[in-house]
Amino acid sequence: MIYIIYRYRYCLVYTMDIFKELILKYPDENVLISPVSILSTLSILNHGAAGSTAEQLSKYIENVNENTPDDKKDDNNDMDVDVPYCATLAIANKIYCSDSIEFHASFLQKIKDDFQTVNFNNANQTKELINEWVKTMTNGKINSLLTSPLPINTRMTVVSAVHFKAMWKYPFSKHLTYTDKFYISKNIVTSVDMMVSTENDLQYVHINELFGGFSIIDIPYEGNSSMVIILPDDIEGLYNIEKHITEENFKKWCGKLYTKSIDLYMPKFKLKMTESYNLVPILENLGLTNIFGYYADFSKMCNETITVEKFLHKTFIDVNEEYTEASAITGVFMTNFSMVYRTKVYINHPFIYMIKDNTGRILFIGKYCYPQ
Protein backbone atom coordinates (compact mmCIF):
# COMPACT_ATOMS: atom_id res chain seq x y z
CA MET A 1 0.00 0.00 0.00
CA ILE A 2 2.85 2.43 0.74
CA TYR A 3 4.27 1.69 -2.70
CA ILE A 4 0.99 2.57 -4.46
CA ILE A 5 0.52 5.85 -2.61
CA TYR A 6 4.13 6.88 -3.24
CA ARG A 7 3.85 6.08 -6.92
CA TYR A 8 0.58 8.00 -7.29
CA ARG A 9 2.09 11.10 -5.70
CA TYR A 10 4.97 11.31 -8.14
CA CYS A 11 2.72 10.55 -11.09
CA LEU A 12 0.46 13.46 -10.08
CA VAL A 13 3.39 15.87 -9.65
CA TYR A 14 4.68 14.92 -13.07
CA THR A 15 1.19 15.21 -14.62
CA MET A 16 0.68 18.75 -13.40
CA ASP A 17 4.22 19.77 -14.39
CA ILE A 18 3.95 18.65 -17.99
CA PHE A 19 0.35 19.87 -18.37
CA LYS A 20 1.29 23.36 -17.21
CA GLU A 21 4.23 23.43 -19.63
CA LEU A 22 1.92 22.54 -22.52
CA ILE A 23 -0.78 25.09 -21.74
CA LEU A 24 1.92 27.76 -21.50
CA LYS A 25 3.14 26.75 -24.94
CA TYR A 26 -0.39 26.57 -26.41
CA PRO A 27 -2.34 29.23 -24.46
CA ASP A 28 -5.24 29.57 -26.92
CA GLU A 29 -5.50 25.99 -28.15
CA ASN A 30 -7.09 22.74 -27.04
CA VAL A 31 -4.51 20.65 -25.18
CA LEU A 32 -4.76 16.89 -24.79
CA ILE A 33 -2.21 14.40 -23.38
CA SER A 34 -1.99 11.03 -21.66
CA PRO A 35 0.37 11.35 -18.68
CA VAL A 36 0.49 7.60 -17.98
CA SER A 37 1.55 6.90 -21.55
CA ILE A 38 4.39 9.43 -21.38
CA LEU A 39 5.45 8.27 -17.91
CA SER A 40 5.61 4.62 -18.96
CA THR A 41 7.76 5.62 -21.95
CA LEU A 42 10.16 7.45 -19.64
CA SER A 43 10.26 4.30 -17.51
CA ILE A 44 11.40 2.31 -20.52
CA LEU A 45 14.17 4.84 -21.18
CA ASN A 46 15.15 4.62 -17.53
CA HIS A 47 16.07 0.95 -17.98
CA GLY A 48 18.86 2.00 -20.33
CA ALA A 49 19.95 5.19 -18.57
CA ALA A 50 23.10 5.74 -16.51
CA GLY A 51 24.99 8.63 -14.93
CA SER A 52 23.40 12.08 -15.03
CA THR A 53 20.69 10.87 -17.43
CA ALA A 54 19.51 8.33 -14.86
CA GLU A 55 19.72 10.96 -12.11
CA GLN A 56 17.41 13.30 -14.03
CA LEU A 57 14.94 10.54 -14.87
CA SER A 58 14.90 9.56 -11.19
CA LYS A 59 12.89 12.69 -10.43
CA TYR A 60 9.86 10.90 -11.84
CA ILE A 61 10.92 7.27 -12.16
CA GLU A 62 13.57 6.15 -9.66
CA ASN A 63 11.69 7.42 -6.62
CA VAL A 64 9.01 4.89 -7.49
CA ASN A 65 11.42 2.02 -7.93
CA GLU A 66 13.18 2.68 -4.61
CA ASN A 67 9.93 1.84 -2.84
CA THR A 68 9.10 -1.16 -4.98
CA PRO A 69 8.89 -4.40 -2.98
CA ASP A 70 11.98 -6.58 -3.40
CA ASP A 71 10.05 -9.30 -5.20
CA LYS A 72 9.04 -6.79 -7.89
CA LYS A 73 12.35 -5.03 -8.51
CA ASP A 74 13.44 -7.49 -11.18
CA ASP A 75 10.01 -7.86 -12.74
CA ASN A 76 10.33 -7.36 -16.49
CA ASN A 77 7.03 -5.52 -16.53
CA ASP A 78 7.82 -2.98 -13.84
CA MET A 79 7.59 -0.18 -16.38
CA ASP A 80 3.98 -1.06 -17.17
CA VAL A 81 1.15 1.09 -15.88
CA ASP A 82 -1.04 -0.71 -13.36
CA VAL A 83 -4.54 0.38 -14.41
CA PRO A 84 -7.63 -1.22 -12.86
CA TYR A 85 -10.44 -2.36 -15.14
CA CYS A 86 -12.08 0.65 -16.74
CA ALA A 87 -13.59 -0.69 -19.99
CA THR A 88 -11.01 -0.46 -22.80
CA LEU A 89 -7.56 1.02 -22.18
CA ALA A 90 -4.63 0.35 -24.50
CA ILE A 91 -1.35 2.18 -23.85
CA ALA A 92 1.04 1.99 -26.78
CA ASN A 93 4.71 2.88 -26.29
CA LYS A 94 7.56 2.06 -28.60
CA ILE A 95 11.26 2.82 -28.92
CA TYR A 96 12.60 2.68 -32.47
CA CYS A 97 16.39 2.38 -32.72
CA SER A 98 18.86 2.06 -35.55
CA ASP A 99 19.49 -1.51 -36.72
CA SER A 100 23.22 -0.75 -36.85
CA ILE A 101 23.47 -0.67 -33.05
CA GLU A 102 24.05 -3.78 -30.93
CA PHE A 103 22.01 -3.52 -27.72
CA HIS A 104 22.79 -5.21 -24.41
CA ALA A 105 20.81 -8.42 -23.85
CA SER A 106 19.84 -7.30 -20.34
CA PHE A 107 18.19 -4.17 -21.74
CA LEU A 108 16.38 -6.03 -24.52
CA GLN A 109 15.06 -8.55 -22.00
CA LYS A 110 13.49 -5.79 -19.91
CA ILE A 111 11.77 -3.80 -22.64
CA LYS A 112 10.60 -6.75 -24.74
CA ASP A 113 7.76 -5.68 -27.06
CA ASP A 114 8.38 -1.96 -26.51
CA PHE A 115 11.54 -2.01 -28.63
CA GLN A 116 12.15 -2.37 -32.37
CA THR A 117 15.16 -1.84 -34.64
CA VAL A 118 14.65 -0.09 -37.97
CA ASN A 119 16.70 1.21 -40.88
CA PHE A 120 16.43 4.97 -40.59
CA ASN A 121 18.15 5.31 -43.98
CA ASN A 122 14.89 4.05 -45.46
CA ALA A 123 12.98 7.05 -44.14
CA ASN A 124 9.62 6.54 -45.88
CA GLN A 125 9.38 2.87 -44.97
CA THR A 126 10.19 3.64 -41.33
CA LYS A 127 7.56 6.38 -41.26
CA GLU A 128 4.91 4.00 -42.59
CA LEU A 129 5.97 1.31 -40.12
CA ILE A 130 5.57 3.66 -37.16
CA ASN A 131 2.26 5.07 -38.41
CA GLU A 132 0.79 1.60 -39.01
CA TRP A 133 1.74 0.54 -35.47
CA VAL A 134 0.09 3.63 -33.99
CA LYS A 135 -3.06 3.06 -36.06
CA THR A 136 -3.30 -0.52 -34.81
CA MET A 137 -2.69 0.35 -31.16
CA THR A 138 -5.31 3.14 -31.13
CA ASN A 139 -7.99 1.10 -32.89
CA GLY A 140 -7.74 3.29 -35.97
CA LYS A 141 -8.48 6.54 -34.14
CA ILE A 142 -5.00 7.92 -34.81
CA ASN A 143 -3.96 7.09 -38.37
CA SER A 144 -0.56 8.75 -38.38
CA LEU A 145 1.92 9.96 -35.80
CA LEU A 146 4.50 11.12 -38.33
CA THR A 147 3.49 13.48 -41.12
CA SER A 148 6.96 13.53 -42.70
CA PRO A 149 9.89 11.08 -42.79
CA LEU A 150 12.44 11.16 -39.98
CA PRO A 151 15.95 12.46 -40.80
CA ILE A 152 18.25 9.66 -41.97
CA ASN A 153 20.70 10.48 -39.16
CA THR A 154 18.08 9.55 -36.54
CA ARG A 155 19.42 7.01 -34.05
CA MET A 156 16.45 6.57 -31.76
CA THR A 157 12.83 7.74 -31.70
CA VAL A 158 10.32 7.34 -28.87
CA VAL A 159 6.60 7.33 -29.66
CA SER A 160 3.61 6.96 -27.37
CA ALA A 161 -0.10 6.55 -28.05
CA VAL A 162 -3.11 5.50 -26.00
CA HIS A 163 -6.66 4.36 -26.70
CA PHE A 164 -9.48 4.56 -24.14
CA LYS A 165 -13.18 3.77 -24.45
CA ALA A 166 -15.73 3.61 -21.64
CA MET A 167 -19.50 3.80 -21.32
CA TRP A 168 -21.02 6.43 -19.05
CA LYS A 169 -22.50 5.07 -15.84
CA TYR A 170 -25.34 7.56 -16.37
CA PRO A 171 -25.73 7.89 -20.17
CA PHE A 172 -27.02 11.09 -21.72
CA SER A 173 -30.41 10.86 -23.46
CA LYS A 174 -29.93 11.35 -27.21
CA HIS A 175 -33.41 12.81 -27.68
CA LEU A 176 -32.55 15.58 -25.20
CA THR A 177 -29.42 16.76 -27.06
CA TYR A 178 -29.93 20.26 -28.46
CA THR A 179 -27.96 23.11 -30.05
CA ASP A 180 -26.64 25.62 -27.53
CA LYS A 181 -24.05 28.38 -27.21
CA PHE A 182 -20.42 27.81 -26.22
CA TYR A 183 -18.52 30.91 -25.10
CA ILE A 184 -14.93 30.79 -26.33
CA SER A 185 -14.58 34.20 -24.67
CA LYS A 186 -16.98 36.91 -23.58
CA ASN A 187 -16.99 38.29 -27.13
CA ILE A 188 -16.68 35.10 -29.20
CA VAL A 189 -19.57 32.63 -29.24
CA THR A 190 -20.07 29.43 -31.24
CA SER A 191 -22.58 26.56 -31.25
CA VAL A 192 -22.26 23.03 -29.87
CA ASP A 193 -24.49 19.98 -29.48
CA MET A 194 -25.34 20.08 -25.78
CA MET A 195 -26.00 16.72 -24.09
CA VAL A 196 -28.32 16.43 -21.10
CA SER A 197 -28.34 14.02 -18.15
CA THR A 198 -30.70 14.74 -15.24
CA GLU A 199 -31.17 13.78 -11.60
CA ASN A 200 -27.93 11.84 -11.14
CA ASP A 201 -26.03 11.63 -7.85
CA LEU A 202 -22.52 12.84 -8.70
CA GLN A 203 -19.45 14.00 -6.79
CA TYR A 204 -19.43 17.81 -6.90
CA VAL A 205 -18.00 20.86 -5.16
CA HIS A 206 -17.82 24.59 -5.72
CA ILE A 207 -14.53 26.18 -4.64
CA ASN A 208 -13.84 29.85 -3.85
CA GLU A 209 -10.19 30.89 -4.05
CA LEU A 210 -8.62 34.35 -4.07
CA PHE A 211 -8.05 34.02 -7.82
CA GLY A 212 -11.71 33.16 -8.47
CA GLY A 213 -14.45 30.59 -8.05
CA PHE A 214 -14.87 27.32 -9.92
CA SER A 215 -16.74 24.02 -9.84
CA ILE A 216 -15.42 20.46 -9.91
CA ILE A 217 -17.58 17.54 -10.95
CA ASP A 218 -16.69 13.84 -11.10
CA ILE A 219 -18.68 11.98 -13.79
CA PRO A 220 -18.36 8.17 -13.51
CA TYR A 221 -17.96 5.62 -16.27
CA GLU A 222 -18.96 1.98 -15.99
CA GLY A 223 -16.09 0.23 -14.23
CA ASN A 224 -13.37 1.98 -12.26
CA SER A 225 -12.80 5.26 -14.08
CA SER A 226 -14.37 8.71 -14.23
CA MET A 227 -14.09 12.12 -15.85
CA VAL A 228 -13.24 15.10 -13.65
CA ILE A 229 -14.11 18.57 -14.92
CA ILE A 230 -12.84 21.87 -13.53
CA LEU A 231 -15.01 24.78 -14.66
CA PRO A 232 -14.35 28.43 -13.75
CA ASP A 233 -17.28 30.65 -12.82
CA ASP A 234 -15.98 33.36 -15.15
CA ILE A 235 -16.09 32.66 -18.90
CA GLU A 236 -12.48 33.87 -19.14
CA GLY A 237 -11.40 32.51 -15.76
CA LEU A 238 -9.57 29.38 -16.90
CA TYR A 239 -6.20 31.14 -17.05
CA ASN A 240 -6.23 31.73 -13.28
CA ILE A 241 -6.95 28.05 -12.62
CA GLU A 242 -4.14 27.05 -14.97
CA LYS A 243 -1.70 29.21 -13.00
CA HIS A 244 -2.70 27.66 -9.68
CA ILE A 245 -3.33 24.01 -10.53
CA THR A 246 -0.67 21.98 -8.72
CA GLU A 247 -0.50 18.53 -7.19
CA GLU A 248 -1.17 19.98 -3.73
CA ASN A 249 -4.08 22.19 -4.80
CA PHE A 250 -5.71 19.50 -6.94
CA LYS A 251 -5.68 16.99 -4.07
CA LYS A 252 -7.02 19.65 -1.70
CA TRP A 253 -9.87 20.61 -4.03
CA CYS A 254 -10.88 17.02 -4.82
CA GLY A 255 -10.83 16.22 -1.12
CA LYS A 256 -13.87 18.49 -0.75
CA LEU A 257 -16.08 16.63 -3.25
CA TYR A 258 -19.43 15.45 -1.93
CA THR A 259 -22.44 13.66 -3.43
CA LYS A 260 -25.09 15.93 -4.92
CA SER A 261 -28.05 15.52 -7.29
CA ILE A 262 -26.98 17.09 -10.60
CA ASP A 263 -28.63 18.07 -13.87
CA LEU A 264 -25.67 18.04 -16.26
CA TYR A 265 -25.44 19.93 -19.55
CA MET A 266 -22.27 18.96 -21.37
CA PRO A 267 -21.01 19.59 -24.93
CA LYS A 268 -20.73 16.69 -27.31
CA PHE A 269 -17.36 16.97 -29.01
CA LYS A 270 -14.68 15.21 -30.99
CA LEU A 271 -11.09 16.39 -31.01
CA LYS A 272 -8.38 15.05 -33.30
CA MET A 273 -4.91 16.56 -33.43
CA THR A 274 -3.49 17.22 -36.87
CA GLU A 275 0.09 17.36 -35.61
CA SER A 276 1.94 15.36 -32.96
CA TYR A 277 3.39 16.98 -29.87
CA ASN A 278 7.18 16.89 -29.88
CA LEU A 279 7.75 16.78 -26.13
CA VAL A 280 11.51 17.34 -26.26
CA PRO A 281 11.41 21.07 -25.29
CA ILE A 282 8.72 20.38 -22.67
CA LEU A 283 10.75 17.63 -21.01
CA GLU A 284 13.89 19.77 -21.17
CA ASN A 285 12.05 22.57 -19.35
CA LEU A 286 11.17 20.03 -16.64
CA GLY A 287 14.87 19.29 -16.13
CA LEU A 288 15.25 16.21 -18.35
CA THR A 289 17.98 17.82 -20.45
CA ASN A 290 20.36 14.86 -20.42
CA ILE A 291 18.00 12.54 -22.25
CA PHE A 292 18.67 14.52 -25.40
CA GLY A 293 21.87 15.70 -27.05
CA TYR A 294 25.54 15.41 -26.17
CA TYR A 295 25.20 14.55 -22.46
CA ALA A 296 22.69 11.69 -22.92
CA ASP A 297 23.99 8.53 -21.25
CA PHE A 298 22.18 5.36 -22.29
CA SER A 299 25.17 3.09 -21.73
CA LYS A 300 22.92 0.45 -20.14
CA MET A 301 21.31 0.11 -23.57
CA CYS A 302 24.48 -0.28 -25.65
CA ASN A 303 28.16 0.66 -25.85
CA GLU A 304 27.64 3.30 -28.53
CA THR A 305 26.75 6.94 -27.94
CA ILE A 306 23.01 7.23 -28.41
CA THR A 307 20.46 9.95 -27.71
CA VAL A 308 16.73 10.49 -28.07
CA GLU A 309 16.06 12.60 -31.17
CA LYS A 310 12.28 12.92 -30.92
CA PHE A 311 9.64 12.28 -28.27
CA LEU A 312 6.28 12.28 -30.05
CA HIS A 313 2.79 12.19 -28.57
CA LYS A 314 -0.57 12.43 -30.36
CA THR A 315 -4.11 12.32 -29.03
CA PHE A 316 -7.76 11.90 -30.00
CA ILE A 317 -11.08 12.11 -28.14
CA ASP A 318 -14.76 11.52 -28.88
CA VAL A 319 -17.32 12.45 -26.21
CA ASN A 320 -20.94 11.59 -26.97
CA GLU A 321 -24.18 10.53 -25.26
CA GLU A 322 -23.20 6.89 -24.77
CA TYR A 323 -19.47 6.81 -24.19
CA THR A 324 -16.10 8.52 -24.24
CA GLU A 325 -13.53 7.22 -26.71
CA ALA A 326 -10.10 8.73 -26.57
CA SER A 327 -6.56 8.48 -27.64
CA ALA A 328 -6.06 11.06 -24.90
CA ILE A 329 -8.32 12.74 -22.37
CA THR A 330 -11.89 14.11 -22.40
CA GLY A 331 -13.30 17.35 -21.09
CA VAL A 332 -16.26 19.21 -19.68
CA PHE A 333 -17.19 22.69 -18.36
CA MET A 334 -19.54 23.58 -15.47
CA THR A 335 -21.52 26.45 -14.01
CA ASN A 336 -23.99 26.30 -11.17
CA PHE A 337 -27.62 27.18 -10.87
CA SER A 338 -29.05 26.28 -7.47
CA MET A 339 -32.45 24.69 -6.99
CA VAL A 340 -33.99 23.31 -3.84
CA TYR A 341 -32.35 19.88 -4.11
CA ARG A 342 -30.55 19.79 -7.44
CA THR A 343 -27.74 21.75 -9.07
CA LYS A 344 -27.72 22.49 -12.79
CA VAL A 345 -24.23 22.34 -14.29
CA TYR A 346 -23.80 24.02 -17.69
CA ILE A 347 -20.53 23.27 -19.45
CA ASN A 348 -20.58 26.08 -21.98
CA HIS A 349 -17.17 27.76 -21.81
CA PRO A 350 -13.47 26.71 -21.58
CA PHE A 351 -12.62 24.08 -18.96
CA ILE A 352 -10.01 21.56 -17.82
CA TYR A 353 -10.90 17.88 -17.96
CA MET A 354 -9.32 14.63 -16.82
CA ILE A 355 -9.98 10.91 -16.96
CA LYS A 356 -8.75 9.05 -13.90
CA ASP A 357 -8.92 5.56 -12.45
CA ASN A 358 -10.23 4.76 -8.98
CA THR A 359 -6.76 5.09 -7.40
CA GLY A 360 -6.66 8.74 -8.49
CA ARG A 361 -4.09 8.18 -11.24
CA ILE A 362 -4.75 10.54 -14.16
CA LEU A 363 -4.94 8.65 -17.46
CA PHE A 364 -5.67 11.73 -19.58
CA ILE A 365 -5.69 15.47 -19.00
CA GLY A 366 -6.71 18.27 -21.31
CA LYS A 367 -7.99 21.78 -21.81
CA TYR A 368 -11.02 22.41 -24.04
CA CYS A 369 -11.38 26.00 -25.17
CA TYR A 370 -12.26 25.96 -28.85
CA PRO A 371 -14.91 23.64 -30.42
CA GLN A 372 -13.70 22.17 -33.70
Curated annotation (Swiss-Prot):
Keyword annotations: Early protein, Host cytoplasm, Protease inhibitor, Serine protease inhibitor
UniProt-listed Gene3D superfamilies: Alpha-1-antitrypsin, domain 1, Antithrombin, subunit I, domain 2
SMART domains referenced in this protein's UniProt entry, alphabetically: SERPIN
Site positions for Reactive bond: 337-338
SUPFAM superfamilies from the UniProt entry: Serpins
Database matches in Pfam families: Serpin
Localization of this protein: Host cytoplasm
Domain of life: Viruses
Predominant subcellular localization, coarse grouping: host cell
InterPro entries named in the record: Serpin_CS, Serpin_dom, Serpin_fam, Serpin_sf, Serpin_sf_1, Serpin_sf_2
GO terms, molecular function: serine-type endopeptidase inhibitor activity
GO cellular component: extracellular space; host cell cytoplasm
Annotated PROSITE patterns: SERPIN
Cross-referenced CDD domains: serpinN_SPI-1_SPI-2 (cd19583)
Family per similarity comment: Belongs to the serpin family. Poxviruses subfamily.
Function, in words: Plays a role in mediating viral host range. May act to inhibit a caspase independent form of apoptosis to allow efficient virus replication in infected cells.
Protein name in UniProt: Serine proteinase inhibitor 1
Species annotation: Variola virus (isolate Human/India/Ind3/1967) (VARV)
